């Protein structure tokens, strides 16, 4: 049986963590990005399919390629973030299943149903994006996930000729708490959950 993490860890991961819009000028190293992936890859996915593919955009050139795809409200926060992760999904993720799920012919589940393959890739890459956020927080980083962007432009700018399709963007860095908005409410258990 697993032990519960400490109250401090819960605060870091959930209750005190915030979505950041402004950033300190502290770089995020490539080694740290590797640490993030080394943690997030262990989060569960359907049949261990692991469809997420991530481009960590950290150069001025990379940010300029992103610029035309960003909504006006997401522009400045993204251009000033040390890193913007483009979380994409691989439409042919099932080609890796003989390695990732050797217990049966899982590849055929998806090659026989393009709709199931797309739904599985999108849903599971979304879960993996959440694992990325938790991994960042566990390593002392802050994040700002965004869905306000032109997916087609990102796909054209970064993934032309590949099997990848963008899902969402996540800014990563060390947040400037002076630029935080007031904490917004969340739904209560009674409003969001049911017991059967």
Curated annotation (Swiss-Prot):
Cofactor: FMN
Deleted gene: phenotype: Cells lacking this gene lose the ability to utilize pyrimidine nucleosides and bases as the sole source of nitrogen at room temperature.
Reactions performed catalytically: 3-hydroxypropanoate + NADP(+) = 3-oxopropanoate + NADPH + H(+)
EC number: 1.1.1.298
Gene Ontology molecular-function annotations: 3-hydroxypropionate dehydrogenase (NADP+) activity; FMN binding
Record key words, sorted: Flavoprotein, FMN, NADP, Oxidoreductase
Entry keyword annotation includes Oxidoreductase: yes
GO BP, sorted A to Z: DNA damage response; nitrogen utilization; pyrimidine nucleobase catabolic process; uracil catabolic process
Conditions for induction: Up-regulated by the nitrogen regulatory protein C (NtrC also called GlnG) and repressed by RutR.
Name of one Pfam family that matches: Nitroreductase
EC class (word): oxidoreductase
Homology family: Belongs to the nitroreductase family. HadB/RutE subfamily.
Other observations noted: The Rut pathway degrades exogenous pyrimidines as the sole nitrogen source at room temperature but not at 37 degrees Celsius, a restriction that is apparently a consequence of an inadequate ability to remove toxic malonic semialdehyde at the higher temperature (RutE/YdfG function).
Function: May reduce toxic product malonic semialdehyde to 3-hydroxypropionic acid, which is excreted. RutE is apparently supplemented by YdfG. Required in vivo, but not in vitro in pyrimidine nitrogen degradation.
Protein name: Probable malonic semialdehyde reductase RutE
Organism of provenance: Escherichia coli (strain K12)
Gene name of this polypeptide: rutE
């Amino acid at each position: 049986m697993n032990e519960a993490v400490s109250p401090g860890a819960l605060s870091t991961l959930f209750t005190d963590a915030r979505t950041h819009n402004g950033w300190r000028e502290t770089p995020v190293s490539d080694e740290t990005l590797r640490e993030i992936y080394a943690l997030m890859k262990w989060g569960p996915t359907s049949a261990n399919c692991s469809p997420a593919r991530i481009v960590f955009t950290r150069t001025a050139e990379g940010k300029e390629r992103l610029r035309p795809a960003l909504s006006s409200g997401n522009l400045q926060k993204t251009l000033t973030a040390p890193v913007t992760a483009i979380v994409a999904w691989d439409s042919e993720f099932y080609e890796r299943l003989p390695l990732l799920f050797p217990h049966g012919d899982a590849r055929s589940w998806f090659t026989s149903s393009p709709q199931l393959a797309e739904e599985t890739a999108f849903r599971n890459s979304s879960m993996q994006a959440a694992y990325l956020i938790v991994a960042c927080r566990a390593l002392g980083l802050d994040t700002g996930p965004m869905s306000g962007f032109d997916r087609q432009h990102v796909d054209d700018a970064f993934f032309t000729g590949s099997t990848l399709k963008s899902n969402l963007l996540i800014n990563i860095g060390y947040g400037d708490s002076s630029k935080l908005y007031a904490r917004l409410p969340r739904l209560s258990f009674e409003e969001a959950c049911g017991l059967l």
